[in-house]
């Protein structure tokens, strides 16, 4: 019987059949492994287990009474036995992930954190590039469901899958494409798509969330500000904190990364597929986080939009400004400046966390942040 001790977690690998004939020797072997190791969490990996009977279940009951145990990689057949006998309500039991091959799949969208593929005519798969933690992905799916039941047009996943050493989620979506692709493919409908984009943002930012478990983005910005405090002088740090303090707390949704690669078009309806940054808070945070990919990254790294979006920097900036004009119903440079101010807090933080070696971007964003902090005493944008 194989096992692995990783930190304070002991994983034991079971295989074959766990029935009345094998239960006693398997139980004895489990106790030998347990006795020889120091651990806090006990995990049973059942990827190679074909069947479990009531005798095997009784062994798990006895172990549960003594240890903090969980079960992972249970096949569908084995998981069904756990579910029918009520074990899934008393133990943490995870099904084995379905494995899929994307060798011949078409890429229909990509970003910093994920890539979206069309698996077949009915199904798309979002593959996570920077996390292999199923718990983090399950958290995003819970956030997506919260948005969906609140009336936000959100694509709901039906399966978590494994692609090599990466994880992904499947969505049933017919005849869909990213909003980025739709805009580039149907230039004659640019204004129509832009109007729908602005309406989607408005819908998100005016929909109240009653679930206290959804994170508050303002608290996240306080954390960002504390993290970059060593990069700011005292005067501008205190001014930035004062302006964050002045923003009214809201319980309306903020997507947090709603650029047009994270939106799908299906039958002319816009649907969100990337929900890991969902939170509640003031709409200025929504518009500030959009300034980053459309404009801010280009300021110290020309050509960034070409590489990330496949469009010219000036076109990305034009799209963002046109989007704000529709959102507010006017072209107001003061409102845009105040949004930029909040955006540069995010940008200094992003650079500090992800590309600390990029001194030019840090100095550029910090300099523009200082200028706006000196210019404005509030971040009121009329919302």
Question: Where are the language model's segments positioned?
Answer:
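STAS-typified acidic loop motif
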Residues: 1-28
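Short, glycine/acidic-enriched loop or turn micro-motifs at the edges of active sites
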Residues: 18, 48, 162, 175, ...
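Amphipathic alpha-helical interaction surfaces in cytosolic regulatory modules
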Residues: 18-91
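Conserved N-terminal boundary motif of the eukaryotic protein kinase catalytic domain
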Residues: 99-107
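ATP-binding pocket architecture of kinase catalytic cores
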Residues: 106-107, 112-212
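An alpha-helical support segment within catalytic cores of ATP-dependent transferases
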Residues: 206-256, 260-261, 266-267
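Active-site Asp-x-Gly
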Residues: 266-317
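Helix-rich C-terminal or lid/interface subdomains of diverse kinases
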Residues: 306-383
């Amino acid at each position: 019987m194989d096992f692995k001790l990783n930190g304070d977690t002991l994983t034991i690998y079971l295989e074959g059949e766990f029935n009345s004939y094998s239960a006693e020797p398997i139980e004895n072997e489990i106790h030998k492994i347990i006795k020889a190791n120091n651990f806090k969490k006990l995990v049973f990996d059942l990827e190679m287990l074909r069947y479990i009977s009531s005798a095997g279940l009784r062994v798990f009951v006895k172990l549960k009474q003594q240890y903090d145990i969980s079960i992972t990689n249970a096949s569908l057949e084995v998981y069904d036995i756990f579910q029918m006998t009520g074990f899934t309500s008393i133990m943490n039991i995870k099904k084995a992930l379905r494995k899929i091959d994307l060798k011949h799949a078409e890429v229909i969208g990509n970003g910093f954190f994920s890539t979206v593929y069309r698996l077949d005519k009915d199904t798309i798969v979002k593959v996570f590039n920077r996390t292999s933690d199923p718990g983090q992905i399950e958290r995003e799916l819970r956030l997506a469901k919260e948005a969906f039941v609140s009336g936000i047009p959100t694509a709901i996943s039906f399966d978590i899958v494994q692609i090599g050493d990466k994880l992904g989620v499947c969505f049933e979506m017919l005849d869909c494409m990213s909003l980025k692709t739709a805009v580039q493919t149907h230039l004659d409908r640019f204004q129509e798509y832009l109007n729908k984009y602005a309406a989607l943002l408005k819908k998100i930012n005016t929909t109240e969330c009653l679930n206290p478990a959804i994170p508050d983005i303002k608290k996240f910005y306080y954390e960002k500000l504390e993290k970059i405090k060593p990069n700011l002088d005292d005067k501008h740090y205190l001014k930035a904190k004062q302006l964050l303090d002045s923003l009214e707390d809201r319980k309306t949704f903020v997507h947090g990364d709603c650029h047009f690669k994270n939106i799908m078009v299906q039958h002319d309806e816009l649907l969100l597929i990337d929900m890991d940054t969902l939170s509640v808070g003031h709409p200025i945070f929504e518009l500030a986080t959009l300034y980053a990919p459309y404009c801010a990254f280009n300021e110290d790294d020309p050509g960034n939009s070409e590489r990330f979006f496949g469009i010219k920097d000036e076109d990305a900036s034009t799209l963002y400004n046109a989007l704000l004009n529709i959102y507010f119903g006017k072209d107001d440079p003061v409102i845009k400046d105040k949004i930029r101010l909040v955006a540069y807090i995010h940008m200094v933080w992003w650079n500090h966390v992800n590309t600390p070696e990029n001194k030019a971007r840090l100095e550029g964003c910090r300099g523009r942040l200082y200028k706006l902090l000196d210019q404005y005493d509030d971040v009121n944008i009329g919302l």
